[in-house]
Amino acid sequence: MNAPDRFELFVLPDGAKKVTMVRDTKIPNASMFTILKEDHTIGNLIRMQLIADQDIIFAGYRMPHPLEHNVNIRIQTNNNTNPLECVQKSMECLSREFTSLENSFIEQVQKKRNVADQYI
């Protein structure tokens, strides 16, 4: 078959950067971030987190082609900040949310195990 190997969907080629940023020359305070080997899951998470930021004027993402697992995220900010700072702030916030979710999940699993152990 002509299908690519599955590992090609998530393994970065040698020397490739996971994230690149290109400033938009036509729109002030705008940049395009390209994230390699990711899909709609990451694109939508980042976009939704960026939209929650008061300094963001526009945040959107797209996948250039369905067979390429790359996400382009376009961001425009107001004059109070720049796109890179907003992305960094959003990533930190998402990281805290994921840590909280993981801790909550582990706590609930332990509670469930303790209840199950009572009946054994």
UniProtKB/Swiss-Prot annotation:
Subcellular location: Nucleus
Transit peptide in keyword set: no
Keyword terms, alphabetized: DNA-directed RNA polymerase, Nucleus, Transcription
One Gene Ontology MF term: protein dimerization activity
Record bears the keyword Cell inner membrane: no
GO annotation, biological process: transcription by RNA polymerase II
SUPFAM superfamilies: RBP11-like subunits of RNA polymerase (SSF55257)
Family annotation (Gene3D superfamilies): RNA polymerase, RBP11-like subunit
One cellular component (GO) term of this entry: RNA polymerase II, core complex
Subunit structure as annotated in this protein's UniProt entry: Component of the RNA polymerase II (Pol II) complex consisting of 12 subunits.
Role of this protein: DNA-dependent RNA polymerase catalyzes the transcription of DNA into RNA using the four ribonucleoside triphosphates as substrates. Component of RNA polymerase II which synthesizes mRNA precursors and many functional non-coding RNAs. Pol II is the central component of the basal RNA polymerase II transcription machinery. It is composed of mobile elements that move relative to each other. RPB11 is part of the core element with the central large cleft.
Family: Belongs to the archaeal Rpo11/eukaryotic RPB11/RPC19 RNA polymerase subunit family.
The protein's name in its UniProt record: DNA-directed RNA polymerase II subunit rpb11
